[in-house]
Each structure stands twice: as structure tokens, then as C-alpha cells.
Amino acid sequence: MTNWLQKRVRLSPGETALVFEGKQETFEEIYEAVEKLAGKLFARGIRKDEMVALLGKNDRMTFLLIHALQQLGAITLFLNNRLTKKEITFQLANAEVKQVIVADAFVDKVTSGISYEELQQTTYVEPDLCKTWDLSRTASVMYTSGTTGKPKGVMQTYENHWWSAVSSVLNLGLTEKDSWLCAVPIFHISGLSIMMRSVIYGIPVYLEEHFDEEKITQLLESGKISTISVVTSMLERLLKIQGGSYHPNVRTVLLGGGPANKAVLEICKQRDIPLVQSFGMTETASQIVTLPPKDALNKIGSSGKALFPAEVKIADDGEILLKGPSITPGYLHNEKATAKAFIDGWFKTGDIGYLDEEGFLFVLERRSDLIISGGENIYPTEIEHVIGAYEAVEEVAVVGKSDAKWGSVPVAFIVVNEGFDEGVLKDICQTNLASFKIPKQITIVEHLPKTASGKIQRNKLKERHSN
């Protein structure tokens, strides 16, 4: 297939591609800057099919470098800038990285690498750019969070990114006024997929270095934005300061990272906020299942239905299986994990769930997080939704604790707000949960342990009870 950025420049050179810190740049201007950077990377010895790590942040330079590495045909390993040096070193070694490009702010996190400043000072050499892309080639690698063990490098091909973009547009549609606000990290698939869609659709990315709910709200009220991607914590922060509806041009608030609770859904309905819930993974190149606003309150807790090119089914043991062209071919240098992840062509998500009679997917739990108590299956998310509905609870995580009588019982860890009353919480649990589902212990903590990508590390909470 024709190189996407080169094709986009030929189709719509004068259309806005990037807005960062108030400055607008067209696709033609972006390409000129990308080509210059590609020449400097080429001068540094970076060639097609080489594994190059990128440690950056949500800024113009990182945005340009992602495109420049693609123009050269290099494979980009996206490093999470929140990781420790030890974690980054593991990924660099595991991926057999040839070179590291690192933002000046993060040079202490790598043993050696080319800083952004050093790259800018490099003399330009005319690069050998890719005119076409083999869709089966690996474009990017991202390591999973490793909540239960060592992270694995997820390979994402150009085909994966292409079909992710096509699936999204078939679901959400496309208009000439569209633009995508990106305040999620571009080293995660949620952010990178926005960049890919921008080029394929020909729409601008409004890139934000940090999530500032007041600034984001101003943008959503300005009429400049049609779509924004958020996770639950970001949405909740927006709702706390948002008093009315957003500008009518905002037609999609795409939520990832788990379904919204009823309270959030009702606020969104009252304020005419077009919330689209989704389910996706690094392995699926972003969203693969979505729930539109019209179904949100009727299907509370559901992630929706599979996007057009994708399929979903439930295995005999309750595991959610996926199939589709956006799904990874496997894990980098890990044939064993790749083989284990697929069964008869279906990708094993590791999540437990079910399809209701209308085909809507409900994700219940990670298989490893399921609590089996006296023969009863207990899903932590069910308990978390009940506890999380109490406004004095900021965050909650439920895990299983070994029990001599029942095998395992649920216990809860909570972060509380002012006004918390344990008696009120116990009443809520007794009213809404079967007795065997009520946490046998509730521990108040200052914060929940999380990975660099914000996922709760349940294994660390389990360790607190096993020690």
C-alpha cells in the first residue's frame, strides 16, 4: 500500500494535520519537518526493518519522530516514560533494540541513546524513504503492563493499524469538521491510533502534553473538537468541572479502560455528552468493541458489540475470544506466549465475560482475578461497581484472600474522600450484594498500586494479605 503520509500530502496538503501549543501545521508542513528528521535519523545509521526505541512524550518532536521512523521503514518500540530505568532496560534488551531516541528530559532513564538535542544537531543526509508499505510488516511494538508477570512485546503491523482505523470510521463515521483531541499518551496504543487515523482520514490531531481538565473543557466548548479519547479517571475529572453541554461539534467522547458506572452515564445523558464506551487492548490495536450512547443506560456494564471487521465469542470456560484483522500476529521473540495466546485462530484475551441475548459483550474479570469462594464465582468488578457508587469512595480494588473454610474470600482496598462513613458503605454492600460477595475486610489506603499505564496491580494487593 502507498505510504500513508506521502499519500495524504498529495491528497490534502493544505489541511491541518497537527495543533500543538496553539500552533497549527498542515500535512505538507508536517511532511517537510518529518523528511528533515528522517534525514538526520538516516545519518545516524537508522535503516529499514531495524528496531529503534523511542522514549518521548506528547509533544511535537515525538509526533514528528514517530512519522519519521515510519518513513524510513524502521520498527518503533514505544517506551513508556513513566517506567523506571530497570523496566526500560529489560524492554530494550528483550526487543534487541539497535538504537534509542530519547527526549532530553528522560536521558537518565537509558544507558545510551541519541537525545533529541543531539539529533537536531546532526547533519542531514538524504534518506531512503519508503514509497510503499507491506501491510504485513511490523510497524510498532508496545510492551504490555505486566500486572501478573514480565511484560511481553506486542507486535503491531501496518495492517493492524489500517484495520483499526477503518473499523473506527465505519463505527463513528467521518465528517469534514472532524478533529481528534489527544490527551492520552502517544506511546500507548490509544494515542498512537489517533495519529494513524489522522493520516488515514485526513483530520487534525489536537495534541496535549498533559491532561488538564480545565483546558480540555475549554477546547470541548470551543467548537474545534469533534472527538476525544479518555479513560474513566479523565472522564470523571471532566464531569466534576463541566456544568453544561459541550459544543454541538463534539460528537464522540470515546471511553476506554472499562465501562462507566450508572452515575457517570446519567450525568452524560443529562448533559448530552455523546459517550461511546469501548473495549480494546494493545493486542487489538485499540478499540475492537464499542457501545454507542443510545444503548448506554439500557446496557450498563456492557462494552458493546464487535466492530464491523471483528468477531467475538465466549469460550466454554467463559474467556472472551476475538478475531479480526486488527489483532496482533503475536509477541516479539516469544513464540511460546504467542502460541498460548491463540486457539484455532481466535485471540484469547484473558478476560472472562459473556454475550447477552442481543449480542452485547459484558467483560466481568481477568481470569487471574476471578475469586472462587466455596464453589461460587465472584467477579471483583461487580463488587467494585457497588462500592464505587458510594460518592465518598474515590477508588476501589477487590481481590481474593486465602481462607481456610471457603478457599478464598473477597477483600476490598479503598481510597476515600471527605465524609466517608464505613457504616454507610457496609449498608450499601448488604443491600446490593449477596452475603458471599460482601468483602470480609475493607482496608483504607492512601493510593492503589498501579502500573506505569495506570492499571491497578492486584497482585501487589494480594501480596499484602499473603505476607
UniProtKB/Swiss-Prot annotation:
Keyword tags: ATP-binding, Ligase, Menaquinone biosynthesis, Nucleotide-binding
HAMAP family listed in its UniProt record: MenE
Gene from which the chain derives: menE
Single biological process term from Gene Ontology: fatty acid metabolic process
Pathway entry: Quinol/quinone metabolism; 1,4-dihydroxy-2-naphthoate biosynthesis; 1,4-dihydroxy-2-naphthoate from chorismate: step 5/7; Quinol/quinone metabolism; menaquinone biosynthesis
Assigned protein family: Belongs to the ATP-dependent AMP-binding enzyme family. MenE subfamily.
GO terms for MF: ATP binding; medium-chain fatty acid-CoA ligase activity; o-succinylbenzoate-CoA ligase activity
Name this polypeptide is given: 2-succinylbenzoate--CoA ligase
Catalysed reactions, semicolon-separated: 2-succinylbenzoate + ATP + CoA = 2-succinylbenzoyl-CoA + AMP + diphosphate
Source organism (scientific name): Listeria innocua serovar 6a (strain ATCC BAA-680 / CLIP 11262)
Function comment: Converts 2-succinylbenzoate (OSB) to 2-succinylbenzoyl-CoA (OSB-CoA).
Record-linked InterPro entries: AMP-bd_C, AMP-bd_C_sf, AMP-binding_CS, AMP-dep_synth/lig_dom, ANL_N_sf, MenE
ATP-binding as UniProt keyword: yes
EC numbers for this chain: 6.2.1.26
